[in-house]
Amino acid sequence: MSQIVRVALDVPLYRYFDYLVSGDEQVTAADIGRRVQVPFGRRTMIGIIVDLPPTSDLPNEQLRPIETVLHDLPRLPDDWLRLTEFCSGYYHAPPGQVMLSTLPVALRSPKSAKGARRLARPATSAAGGQALPALRAEQEAALAAIHQAGPGFHSFLLHGVTGSGKTEVYLRLIESSLLAGKQALLLVPEINLTPQLEARVAARFPSVALVSLHSGLGEAARQRNWQAALTGTARIVLGTRLAAFTPLPELGLIIVDEEHDPSFKQQDGVRYSARDLAVFRARQLAIPIVLGSATPSLESWANATAGVGRSRYQLLSLRERAVAGARLPLVRRIDTRLDRAENGLSAALRAALAQRLECGEQSLLFLNRRGYAPVVGCPACGWTSGCPRCAAHLVLHLRDRCLRCHHCGFAVPVAKACPTCGNQNLIAFGRGTQRLEATLAEIFPQARVLRVDRDSASTRRQWEALAARIDGGQADILVGTQMLAKGHDFARLTLVGVIAPDAALFAADWRAAERLFAQLMQ
C-alpha cells in the first residue's frame, strides 16, 4: 500500500495537499515538520510535511509523488506547527502561507533549498563581561514574584516608568533561563531598538550564542541566525515581530518589550499580533512570559487588573527610576492660541532651544510626520494631493521633488501646476520633519540639526551611523518621528519638545488617544 504525506504549500488556499511517497523514499512520523520538495501544477515547490494520513480524499491514482524529503536541517518542532496552525485559524490565513512565510527565503525556494546546511554556523558574541548592577527593592520584588510562581505557564505584566530598570529585570530572567539550560526569546517592536539592546545583552552574556532576527538583515544573515535558533546553537534570540515564529527546541522564556507598541501587529500579508502569539506560545509550552511597558495597552492593563480570579496577568510595578535621585521630567504645556507659534515653534520653545545651545546640551523635537508637508493644495479650486490608490494624502518630499503616499508607496513628481484648474501657485500645507529641519537651520544657523526618520534611517547601517553622531556629540538639535522617541538613552539630551501633539487625536484610529499618551510618556 502506498504511503501518503500531507503537505502545507505557500498558496492562497485554506487546505493541505496530499502526495504519495516515491519508492526510494522512506517517511516516518519523525519526518513531520520537515521540508519537502513536491510538484505543484507546472512548478516545483517547497512545502512542509504536517501529517501522514492513512487515506486521502482522492484516489491514489490522482496523487502525485513527492520529489524529495529535505534532511539538511532538523525538522520543525511540534510546538511550531501548532503555533502556525493556531495563527492560521485565529487570523483566517491560509495555513501554508503562514508556515512558509515565516521561513527564510532560501529555505522555501527549490533552487537554494539544498544550500541550507552550508550556511548554518554558530553565532557567538565576542563582547567582554560586565559587572552586575545592584538591584532596587522594586526590581528584586518583581524578580522574586516571577521566580516564586514556579514552573509552568505564568504571564506577567511588568509596568515600569521610563528608566525604571525593566531591561535589567529582563537580563536577570534571561540569566535564570540560561542556567536552567533553556533558550530565551526577547521581542522588541522596532528594528532600530535592536542594536542598542543587542549590545547590552551581548555584554552581559559574552560566552552565550546570541542572534538577532529582523527585516533589516540580509537573507544570508537571517538564514544563518534562524538555523542557529532551530538547531539550538543560539541560546538567546532577539528580534522583531516575525521572530515570534522562530523555531526554538528548548525555549524556556519569552519577553515582549514595549508590549503596547502597534509595530507588533503585522498589517499586510498574513496579519497577526506577535504579542498575542507569544502569549499563546508560552501557554502551549508551559513557560513564563513577561510583557513589559511604561504605558501598557488597555487590554493588557485590563487583563492584569480585572481582580482576583479574573486577572489573566500578574501585575508587577516599577514606580521609581533606576538611577538614584533621578526624577520624572517637568512637563510644560504651551497653549499656542496665547503663545502663537511661528513656523511651528512657540516663543517659549525657541527660548528653551537657545538656552540648551548655550549650555552645549542636546534637544529633541518630536514631530510624527515624515516629509516636508503632509499635503499640497490649490487655493484657487481647492484641489489637494490625494493618492489615487488609497484614501491617504500624498506627502511632499521636497528634496526628492516628489509626492509620496506613506501608506501604499505610490509616488509621482511634484506637479508644477494644479491638475484641475492649472493654477501654478500651489501651497504646501502643514509641516513634516524635513520642513522643521529647514526651519531650525534658519532660526539657529550655528546649530547642528540632525533629522532621524524613515527617510534618513531606512536601514540599520544608516541608523547606527546617525546614533554614533548623536552619542558623539555631533548634533545639537534632533528632529525625529516615533522611531527616535522611544527606547533610546542619549546622555546629553536635556530638552524634548513635542510639536502639535493634539493633531494625533484626529487620526482615523480608535486607539488614537491611547497611542498619543504612550508616545508622550516615552
Name every feature range the model reports, one short phrase each:
Residues 1-295, 299-301, 305-326, 357-358, ...:
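Accessory, non-ATPase domains that flank or precede helicase/AAA+ motor cores in DNA-metabolism machines
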Residues 12-14, 215, 219, 231-234, ...:
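Cys/His-rich Zn2+-binding cysteine-cluster or related metal-binding knuckle/ribbon modules and their
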Residues 185, 205-217, 316, 388-389, ...:
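Conserved RecA-like helicase motor-core motifs
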Residues 194-205, 376-389, 433-448:
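Conserved helicase motor "Helicase C" RecA-like lobe of SF1/SF2 P-loop NTPases
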Residues 211-219, 261-272, 337-343, 425-429, ...:
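Flexible beta-alpha connector loops of hexameric P-loop NTPases
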Residues 218-230, 448-480:
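Conserved helicase ATPase core of P-loop NTP-dependent helicases/translocases
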Residues 239-251, 373, 440, 460, ...:
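SF2 helicase motor core recognition
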Residues 257-276, 471-476, 481-522:
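Conserved RecA-like helicase motor core of SF1/SF2 enzymes
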